[in-house]
């Protein structure tokens, strides 16, 4: 799986979030390294700033999940 830095992953998440009216106000996505057993994603997000509405959070989770399977967090 291709690797990206935390800044690159955040930029990709923000690019996708900017396309939806419920999430376009988000300016920061905190990227957190995980240490999975097996082949799961090695990162997740921890915070959205500013926090969107409940509907926006659900949409953001879906959009960010689409990034999990495409890139791993670089060492």
Predicted regions and their residues:
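Detector for the mature cores of small, proteolytically processed
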Residues: 18, 33-75
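N-terminal acidic leader/helix
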Residues: 1-28
